[in-house]
């Protein structure tokens, strides 16, 4: 993303700040009695003295990696040693967070110093707490107005972030607004006008709220923190115009936290732009999979993918598999398989962007709470979402890029538990993609060795369900939705082409 001279619409990082710190004073949360922020706050951000610019030389940029022995020796090992307020240490303990993870140990002290932070760590490594705890620490000292804006690439991830902020900030009486599509925008605009402590949003919805009512931009005039979770996806070209609106509403003097499971060229460029006073920590040691994950593939005839899927799912109890995520490449396939399994009487829920938001959240809740054993999903569920226990991942469609494969199969075999992934190989293209995946993960996938001689026993039932599912897709207008999305994507690509010219 370009930085165009003085305006710098995509300059995420603030000006270099002094590393000088005033003596730390422990502060109890000032919870429920904060005054209302004036209707027209001053455009200058209310920043603590230790974060203001000074005449002293700015702190140098710091880059560390998980394997840096010298740096690791000085890293705090408990939440109390990180410099957090005692009430936050107590909250972590009450939530079962006894020992900080690597990304938390490295990033939280730097954030408390006032640095901008870019943290790269795998899904499930505790990235949310790495940025939420420093924000809540500051809020405990000065709970006044919208202190933080956190952006996430998907509605589900934004909703999850809001839940985690509320859990961690409960003793503070935290007011957190989730501004996401699929819900009443008028109600969200009113909630934003009440100046909650933390706003968690998708870029599209928050930009729409500001465009519809430019006065809402004043709500962010004193925002101290900007967070981009799954930052490489938030910085995708599809969000560019929304981000211009959002960044134009934020003060230049702020801390910026970028966290992601994947380092991208955009993130590297932004790290260089940040210059001084930034901290980069990478706990991600390339694309790899855990040793407790058994990775298999199975050759499937092109016209029998549904048959093989139903056969594997019907063996869940026999194979002691309690939960399955089936990843597909398109929203159409996701909804189609939802209808198919419904016709076959196999309980499942689907998660994709064509689905109304309330139903998406309900589907995710039902799967996470084990009410439904099968989740059909596009890659919207491959990163960020906190789904603790998944026994089997099926790649119904092989992903185009090895990194997406890593994120998908990373939903299972978490926290030292074992797990299984099975990829359907149907075409020569799938074989090529399989070889690319093997090159990246550094190991060969094994051929599925389960019993498959009975796979055709339900062929008549499955083919009938396939016909009915396709009819339902047409009846409910899903084909029209697919076409509309294609046209929308085409227009976005055309805008990008003109912009590049």
UniProtKB/Swiss-Prot annotation:
Its EC number is 3.6.4.13. A motif (Q motif) lies at residues 77-105. PROSITE patterns: DEAD_ATP_HELICASE, HELICASE_ATP_BIND_1, HELICASE_CTER, Q_MOTIF. Residues 1-68, 473-501 are annotated as: Disordered. Residues 292-456 form the Helicase C-terminal domain. Residues 475-501 form a coiled coil. GO terms for biological process: rRNA processing. This is DEAD-box ATP-dependent RNA helicase 36. It catalyses: ATP + H2O = ADP + phosphate + H(+). GO terms for molecular function: ATP binding; ATP hydrolysis activity; RNA binding; RNA helicase activity. Residues 59-68 have a biased composition (Low complexity). ATP binds at residues 121-128. Residues 487-501 have a biased composition (Basic residues). Residues 108-281 form the Helicase ATP-binding domain.
């Amino acid at each position: 993303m370009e930085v165009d001279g003085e305006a710098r619409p995509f300059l995420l990082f603030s000006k270099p700040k002094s590393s000088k710190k005033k003596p730390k004073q422990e502060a109890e949360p000032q919870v429920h009695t904060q005054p209302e922020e004036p209707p027209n706050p001053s455009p200058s951000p209310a920043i603590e003295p230790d974060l203001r610019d000074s005449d002293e030389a700015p702190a140098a940029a710091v880059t560390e990696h998980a394997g840096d022995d010298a740096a690791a020796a000085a890293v705090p090992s408990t939440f109390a040693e990180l410099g957090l307020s005692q009430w936050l240490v107590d909250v972590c303990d009450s939530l079962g967070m006894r020992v900080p993870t690597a990304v938390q140990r490295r990033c939280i002290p730097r954030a408390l110093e006032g640095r901008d932070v870019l943290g790269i760590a795998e899904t499930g490594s505790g990235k949310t707490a790495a940025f939420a705890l420093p924000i809540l620490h500051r809020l405990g000292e000065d709970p006044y107005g919208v202190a933080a804006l956190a952006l996430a690439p998907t509605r589900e991830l934004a909703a999850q972030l809001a839940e985690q902020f509320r859990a961690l900030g409960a003793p503070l009486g935290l007011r957190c607004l989730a501004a996401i599509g699929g819900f009443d925008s008028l109600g969200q605009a009113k909630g934003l006008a009440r100046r909650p402590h933390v706003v968690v949003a998708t870029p599209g919805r928050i930009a729409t709220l500001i465009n519809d009512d430019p006065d809402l931009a004043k709500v962010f005039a004193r925002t101290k923190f900007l967070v981009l979770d799954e930052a490489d996806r938030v910085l995708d070209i599809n969000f560019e115009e929304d981000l211009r609106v959002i960044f134009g509403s934020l003060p230049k003097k702020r801390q910026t936290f970028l966290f992601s499971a994947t380092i991208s060229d955009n993130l590297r460029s932004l790290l260089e732009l940040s210059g001084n006073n930034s901290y980069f920590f990478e706990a991600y040691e390339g694309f790899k999979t855990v040793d407790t994950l058994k990775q298999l593939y199975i050759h499937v005839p092109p016209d029998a993918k549904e048959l093989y899927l139903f056969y594997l799912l019907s063996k869940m109890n026999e194979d002691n598999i309690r939960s399955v995520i089936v990843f597909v490449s398109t929203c159409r396939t996701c909804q189609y398989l939802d209808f198919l399994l419904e016709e076959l009487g196999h309980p499942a829920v689907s998660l994709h962007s064509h689905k109304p938001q309330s139903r998406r959240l309900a589907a995710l809740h039902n799967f996470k709470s084990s009410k439904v054993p099968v989740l059909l999903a596009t890659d919207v569920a491959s990163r960020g979402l906190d789904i603790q226990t998944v026994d089997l991942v099926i790649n119904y469609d092989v992903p185009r890029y090895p990194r997406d494969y890593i994120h998908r199969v990373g939903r299972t075999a978490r926290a030292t538990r074992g797990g299984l992934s099975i990829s359907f190989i149907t075409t020569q293209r799938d074989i090529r993609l399989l070889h690319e995946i093997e090159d990246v993960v550094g190991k060969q996938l094994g051929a599925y060795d389960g019993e498959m001689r009975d796979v055709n026993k339900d062929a008549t039932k499955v083919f009938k369900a396939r016909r009915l599912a396709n009819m339902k897709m047409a009846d409910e207008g899903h084909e029209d939705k697919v076409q509309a999305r294609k046209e929308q994507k085409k227009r976005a690509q055309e805008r990008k082409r003109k912009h590049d010219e």
